[in-house]
Amino acid sequence: MPSYTLSLLVLCLIVLAFSVVFAVVGYLVRKSVAEAKISSAEHAAKQMIDDAKREAETNKKEAILEVKDEVHKLRSDAEREVRERRNEIQKQEHRLVQKEEILDRKSETLDKKEESLEKREESLAKKQRQVEEMESKMSQLLVEQKQELERVSGLSREEARMIIRQEVEQEIAHETALLIKEKTAEAKETADKRSKEILSLAIQRCSADHVAETTVSVVNLPNDEMKGRIIGREGRNIRALETLTGIDLIIDDTPEAVILSGFDPIRREIARSALEKLVQDGRIHPARIEEMVDKSRREVDETIREYGEQTTFEVGVHGLHPDLIKILGRLRFRTSYGQNVLKHSMEVAHLAGIMAAELGEDVKLAKRAGLLHDIGKAIDHEVEGSHVEIGVELATKYKEHPVVINAIASHHGDTESTSIISTLVAAADALSAARPGARRETLETYIRRLEKLEEISESFDGVEKTFAIQAGREVRIMVRPDVVDDALAHKLARDITKKIEQELDYPGHIRVTVIRETRAVEYAK
């Protein structure tokens, strides 16, 4: 038992010894590990502290550098501003010095001028006293001279003044008359030159392509047998056609042709159209003739309207009343001294427009007035009154512009022109009518008119010779200078003009020129 206990005790002691050893070893191991961890932590902490110090040192240096840069920049700005202010102050000081010098010079100049003015004032005062003394002497002398003149001439002062005034007034009146005459001649010369330029330009830019109209129309036939069918049994067909149209049919020996004669172009056109339709159809009898005449009349009415619309389009005049357009188209079938009135109106419109453009007037209004100036001729054979009166009534009825109405009323001189456009229309009308080839007359009428023109001119006292020239558009009268003076020459021209207007019918205008010539001849021996 005791040995067992001893063994157990020994075993316990051994176990205890191993436990102590293991405990010591474990303690040492843990201590070593702890020390290693502490050393590692201390090293890491030291490393972090070193890094923080280095970073702080770096940031500090950067901050110091930034502060130094900012300080340097502020110092530079301050120095630059100081330099600029110093320069500006120096400039201001320099300017002030210059101004002071200028003021000093001005002050010196003013002082000199003041001295000069004082001297001049003294001189003027002296001269003033001398002038006053001289004026006093002159006044005394004038009084003495006036008294002497009144005594010698026997005229009072007022009478002498009146005589001098009359002489001066006469001299001024004479000089004024000469000046007025000179300026009037100059104005006329300038106006004539400018008007000739405008008229020549208008004529050059306006070309006429129409020819004189005739009073007959010719209808071609397929053969001469058709003439008998047109005449009809006992002439009933030709009588029906003449009765319905008012046109004379001339059927003679002219091969394959029938001549239509009549003064009314519209009726002649209706007859021509109807006859052509009858010839083409072949059925010719009174009933068919009446049908074709009615159809042709409607077609001609439509053609008239188309002519009116085409004319307004070509001329560039718009806004006309439809009835006025149709009346305008009727002018296509009207003639004046052989000149087609519609073509004449278009020509007048173009001429008036060109001249209005040159003078800065309303071109459209001038063209409108020129186109409508002869509108009364379209129906003057149907309505009583002259074509001027009828035209004014039509323009008023269809509410045309007052300038257009005045242009229609005044283009033949029946009414006074109230605008430049009215005058331009009258001039354009005269240009179109006077253009060579525009209008024609028979030879007998032409010769008789020229003889009558010279006869009227020679019927006045003091007329020596007369010459009708320019195809009767001008008459030149040579007068006796011992009977007709310059003033009477103007009156004679007006009197001859009035008598020509009263006794002659003529197209366009006639220029009356009175020539007075005085010759003084001497012979040197």
Curated annotation (Swiss-Prot):
Cellular compartments annotated: Cell membrane
Enzyme nomenclature, EC number: 3.1.-.-
Principal subcellular localization: membrane
Recorded GO MF terms: RNA binding; RNA endonuclease activity
Region (Disordered) location: 109-130
Keyword Acetylation: no
SMART domains linked: HDc (SM00471), KH (SM00322)
GO (cellular component) term, any one: plasma membrane
Boundaries of every HD domain copy: 341-434
Topological relation to the membrane, as annotated: Single-pass membrane protein
Organism domain of life: Bacteria
Keyword annotations of the record: Cell membrane, Endonuclease, Hydrolase, Membrane, Nuclease, RNA-binding, Transmembrane, Transmembrane helix
InterPro entries, per database record: HD/PDEase_dom (IPR003607), HD_domain (IPR006674), HDIG_dom (IPR006675), KH_dom (IPR004087), KH_dom_type_1 (IPR004088), KH_dom_type_1_sf (IPR036612), Ribonuclease_Y (IPR017705), RNase_Y_N (IPR022711)
Pfam name, any one: HD
Family that this chain belongs to: Belongs to the RNase Y family.
HAMAP family the UniProt entry points to: RNase_Y (MF_00335)
Name used for this protein in its record: Ribonuclease Y
Species of the source: Shouchella clausii (strain KSM-K16)
